Amino acid sequence: MAEVSEEIRNLAARHQEFQRQAEALRQEMSMVQASIASCDQAIATINELKAASEAGRAAETMVPVGFGSYVYAEVKNPDKVVVNLGAGFSAEETAEAAVETLNRRKEQLTKILEQMNASLTKIAQGMQALETEAAKIQPGQA
């Protein structure tokens, strides 16, 4: 009986570790999803500003000035965009090149998210296997 109890405790500890891994992975996935949404928003904004300019309308936007405050501003040159390249570096690109850069980054993030989903599935399968094993050890307790 002590063997069974020890084995159940071992399975429970492994299950809890899987749960911790799954939660950490879900949090990371949430950050990646937020980055994908940010790419989508940047692409849409660049395209809208460029379309407004091409149609002869003022390309207006709101610029953050700090502490949740914004000012309205007119974009003088929506054909030029400064894009974050990573590691603290940025570069000025044409609107088209900026959209391409953002689309590439979005594709990379989407692949990462798919890999994370696959990892989460493996963790869930591992948890299920532990639950099945525990049910075999204690059929009346499952």
From Swiss-Prot:
Keywords: Chaperone, Cytoplasm. It holds the Pfam family Prefoldin. The keyword Zinc-finger does not apply. GO terms for biological process: protein folding. The keyword NAD does not apply. InterPro entries: PFD_alpha_archaea, Prefoldin, Prefoldin_subunit_alpha. GO terms for cellular component: cytoplasm; prefoldin complex. It is found in: Cytoplasm. Gene3D superfamilies: 1.10.287.370. Its main location: cytoplasm. GO terms for molecular function: unfolded protein binding. Molecular chaperone capable of stabilizing a range of proteins. Seems to fulfill an ATP-independent, HSP70-like function in archaeal de novo protein folding. Heterohexamer of two alpha and four beta subunits. Belongs to the prefoldin subunit alpha family. This is Prefoldin subunit alpha. It comes from Methanosarcina mazei (strain ATCC BAA-159 / DSM 3647 / Goe1 / Go1 / JCM 11833 / OCM 88).
